[in-house]
C-alpha cells in the first residue's frame, strides 16, 4: 500500500500528529515552543526594504547543495557521475506566477526535509523572534541578513513548494508545500534527477519578481560571482551563420545556414580576486574594474589582497580618479562572503576612509549574521580592518619610493583620501606622515620635510588661486612659495598637522600675514621719517571710508604696483569658518586690516590731490584690495562700478584739455 502523508503543527496540546489518508499509523510527541504563525510576518516586516535578498538566500542554498555533493565525491562518499555539470537554473513561469530555482546538488530524503526544512527552521524561530521582536526596520542592523535561508522565500510567496531527490541510492523523490503558517504537506515527489527545486508561488503584491529584468538585476547584484554557474530562463538559440562579408551563408537546399548557441551563465564563477596577483595582468584588472563598477575611466592603481593567515581575506581595492576636485566622490567597496555579495560599504569591517575607494573584499571568516555593534567590538574584525589599512599604506609607500613621479601625478586624486584617512585613523597618519605631499604655487610637490619654511616654521597656503592671484604674484616676485590647499578637507587637515607638530609647523593663509620678505628693508631713521606720512594716509582713509571696524596699517612693500592689500588674521579666519559651518554669525568677520603700500606712486600722490579726488582714490584702492580678498556684495559692486565710470570721465576730461 502506498501511503500519502500530511503533517499538522501547533495543536493546543503541543503534540505533532502524523496522519495517513487511509489509516492513522502513529502519534509523534513533540514540543513546539514558538507559534510559527508569528515568524513569517516578522520576516516580511523586518526585511521590507530588502525583499530581493530572498533570491540570494535560495540561490546560495543551491550552491551549498552542489558544493556538498562535490565534496562527498571528492572523498569517495558519493558515486561519481560522468558528464555532471553543476549548475543552478532560475526560471520564471509567468502563467503560473511561479519563480523556480533548481539545482543538481545533493538533494534531500524525506527525513532530511523534515530535519532541515521543518525542525531546524522552526526550532530556530524562537531565537529569531527574541532577537527581532523589539527591533524596528531601521535598527535591525544585521549584517547581510544571512541565516534566513529557505524561509526568506515566504517574503514574496503565498506558498512555497520543494521538489527534491537525494543523491543516495534508492532514495525517493519528495514534495513539500507550505503557505508559511502553522502547517505543511509532504508527499512523494516527481523529480527524477538528484537535486532540489524550490517553487515560489509569487503573491499578488510581489508580481515584480516575475519580471525577467528584475530577476536578472537581483542575480547581478547578489550572485554575480557565486562559485557555480547560474542560468536565467535558459534555452538554446538558433542564429544565422555569416560569411566574412557579412552575408548569411546558405545550405545546399538554399535555406539559411544556422547554428545553435548555448545559453551563457549570468555569473562569473572565477572572479579575479581569487587568482594570485602574479597571474593577473593590468588589462584584466582594468576590465574587472569596468565590469563591476561600470566606470570607464581607468583606475589610477590597485591593491590585490591575498591573505590566508591569520584569517582568510581576498580582494582588490582600486584608487579611482576624482573627477570633482572640490568634493570627494564616494567610492564603493563591496563585501563578499565566499563569493556571495553581502553589502556595500560596511564601515564596521572596512575603515570609513577606505570607502572613498572602489573594490571588492571577500572574507569567509567574517561573522555576518551578527549586529553592527558586535562587529565594532569584535577583536578579529578590528584585526581585519587594521590589516586592510596597513596593506593600503604599504602600497602607497611602495609607489612613493619606487615611482615618485607617478606618486606626484596621482596626488591630486589621492590626496583627499590620504588626508581623510589621517584624520580618521591615527595609525594611518603615523604610517603616511613622511609621504604626505604639499603642492606649491609653482607646481612642485614637496613632503613636509622637504618643504621650504620660514624662520618661524610658517607655511603659507592658498585656498583659491584665482581670488588670491594678487597675493600669489607678490610671493612669486619675492621668491617665496605657498602651498595650494583648495580642497574642502584641507582646513581640517592643516589643523591636524599643527596639532601633531606643535613646534614645527604653523599654517598661515597667504592673505593673513605679511612676512618681512615682502617688505622693503628700511633703516630706523627712514621708518621715523615715514611715520608722519603714514599717519596722514591713515587719517585720510579713515575719513573717507568711515568703517570703524576696519583697521589700518602702512607698510613699505616691495610690490610697488600694489596700492593696498587686505589682511585677515589666521585665527579670525578659522573662527569665522567654524562659526559659518555651525550656521552662526561671527562678530569679528569684518575685523580686517587694510595694509596701505607707501611705496606705491598712487598712494604717495593722495595727500596732494583735491579733497574730492582723495575720496575717490581712497575708496577705489579699498575696493581693489577687497576684490583681491573676497567677492564684493551687490551694493559694493554697484558703487565700485560707479566709481570706475567717474574715473574714466575724469581721464577723458583730462585728455580733452
Language-model region placement:
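GHKL (Bergerat-fold) ATPase N-terminal catalytic module, capturing the glycine-rich phosphate-binding loop
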Residues: 8-10, 15-210, 217, 224, ...
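GHKL/Bergerat-fold ATPase module in large chromosome/replication-associated machines
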Residues: 142, 160-183, 203-207, 213-657
Amino acid at each position: 500500500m502506498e501511503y500519502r502523508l500530511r503533517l499538522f503543527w501547533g495543536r493546543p496540546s503541543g503534540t505533532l500528529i502524523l496522519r495517513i489518508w487511509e489509516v492513522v499509523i502513529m502519534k509523534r510527541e513533540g514540543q513546539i515552543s514558538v507559534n510559527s504563525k508569528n515568524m513569517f510576518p516578522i520576516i516580511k516586516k523586518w526585511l521590507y526594504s530588502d525583499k530581493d535578498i530572498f533570491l540570494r538566500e535560495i540561490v546560495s542554498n543551491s550552491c551549498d547543495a552542489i558544493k556538498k555533493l562535490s565534496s562527498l565525491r571528492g572523498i569517495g562518499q558519493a558515486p561519481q557521475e560522468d558528464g555532471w555539470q553543476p549548475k543552478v537554473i532560475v526560471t520564471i513561469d509567468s502563467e503560473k506566477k511561479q519563480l523556480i530555482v533548481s539545482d543538481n546538488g545533493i538533494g534531500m530524503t524525506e527525513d532530511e526535509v523534515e530535519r532541515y526544512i521543518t525542525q531546524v527552521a522552526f526550532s530556530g524561530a524562537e531565537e529569531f523572534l527574541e532577537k527581532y521582536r523589539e527591533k524596528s526596520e531601521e535598527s535591525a542592523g544585521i549584517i547581510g541578513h544571512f541565516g534566513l535561508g529557505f524561509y526568506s522565500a515566504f517574503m514574496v510567496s503565498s506558498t512555497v513548494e520543494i521538489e527534491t531527490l537525494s543523491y543516495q541510492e534508492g532514495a525517493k523523490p519528495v514534495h513539500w508545500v507550505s503557505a508559511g503558517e502553522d502547517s505543511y504537506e509532504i508527499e512523494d515527489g516527481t523529480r527524477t534527477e538528484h537535486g532540489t527545486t524550490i517553487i515560489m508561488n509569487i503573491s499578488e503584491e510581489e508580481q515584480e519578481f516575475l519580471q525577467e529584468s528584475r530577476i536578472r538585476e537581483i542575480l547581478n547584484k547578489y550572485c554575480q560571482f557565486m562559485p557555480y554557474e547560474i542560468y536565467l530562463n535558459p534555452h538554446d538559440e538558433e542564429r544565422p551563420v555569416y560569411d566574412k562579408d557579412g552575408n548569411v551563408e546558405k545550405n545546399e537546399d538554399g535555406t539559411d545556414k544556422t547554428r545553435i548557441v548555448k545559453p551563457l551563465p549570468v555569473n562569473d564563477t572565477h572572479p579575479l580576486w581569487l587568482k594570485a596577483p602574479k597571474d593577473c595582468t593590468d588589462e584584466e584588472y582594468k576590465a574587472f574594474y569596468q565590469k563591476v563598477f561600470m566606470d570607464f575611466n581607468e583606475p589610477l592603481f590597485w591593491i590585490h589582497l591575498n591573505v590566508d593567515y591569520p584569517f582568510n581575506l581576498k580582494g582588490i581595492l582600486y584608487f579611482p580618479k576624482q573627477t570633482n576636485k572640490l568634493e570627494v566622490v564616494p567610492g564603493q567597496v563591496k563585501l563578499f562572503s565566499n563569493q556571495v555579495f553581502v553589502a556595500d560599504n560596511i564601515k564596521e569591517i572596512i575603515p570609513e576612509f577606505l570607502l572613498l575607494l572602489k573594490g571588492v573584499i571577500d572574507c569567509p571568516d567574517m561573522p555576518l549574521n551578527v549586529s553592527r555593534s558586535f562587529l565594532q567590538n569584535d577583536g578579529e574584525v578590528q584585526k581585519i580592518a587594521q590589516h586592510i589599512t596597513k596593506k593600503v599604506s604599504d602600497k602607497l609607500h611602495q609607489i612613493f619610493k619606487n615611482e615618485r613621479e607617478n606618486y606626484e601625478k596621482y596626488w591630486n586624486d589621492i590626496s583627499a583620501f590620504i588626508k581623510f584617512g589621517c584624520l580618521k585613523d591615527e595609525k594611518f597618519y603615523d604610517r603616511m606622515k613622511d609621504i604626505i605631499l604639499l603642492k606649491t604655487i609653482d607646481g612642485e610637490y614637496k613632503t613636509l620635510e622637504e618643504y621650504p619654511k620660514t624662520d618661524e616654521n610658517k607655511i603659507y597656503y592658498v585656498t583659491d588661486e584665482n581670488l588670491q592671484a594678487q597675493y600669489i604674484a607678490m610671493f612669486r616676485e619675492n621668491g617665496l612659495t605657498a602651498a595650494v590647499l583648495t580642497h574642502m578637507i584641507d582646513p581640517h587637515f592643516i589643523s591636524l598637522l599643527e596639532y601633531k607638530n606643535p613646534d614645527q609647523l604653523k599654517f598661515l593663509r597667504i592673505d593673513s600675514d605679511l612676512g618681512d620678505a615682502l617688505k622693503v628693508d628700511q633703516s630706523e631713521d627712514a621708518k621715523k621719517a615715514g611715520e608722519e606720512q603714514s599717519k596722514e594716509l591713515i587719517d585720510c582713509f579713515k575719513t573717507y571710508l568711515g568703517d570703524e571696524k576696519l583697521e589700518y596699517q602702512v607698510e613699505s612693500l616691495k610690490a610697488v604696483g600694489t596700492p593696498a592689500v587686505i589682511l585677515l588674521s589666521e585665527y579670525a579666519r578659522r573662527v569665522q569658518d567654524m562659526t559659518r559651518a555651525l550656521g552662526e554669525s561671527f562678530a569679528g568677520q569684518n575685523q580686517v586690516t587694510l595694509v596701505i603700500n607707501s611705496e606705491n606712486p598712487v598712494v604717495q600722490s593722495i595727500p596732494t590731490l583735491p579733497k574730492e579726488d582723495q575720496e575717490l582714490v581712497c575708496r577705489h584702492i579699498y575696493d581693489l584690495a577687497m576684490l583681491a580678498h573676497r567677492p564684493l556684495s551687490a551694493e559694493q559692486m554697484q558703487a565700485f562700478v560707479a566709481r570706475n565710470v567717474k574715473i574714466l570721465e575724469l581721464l577723458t576730461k583730462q585728455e580733452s584739455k
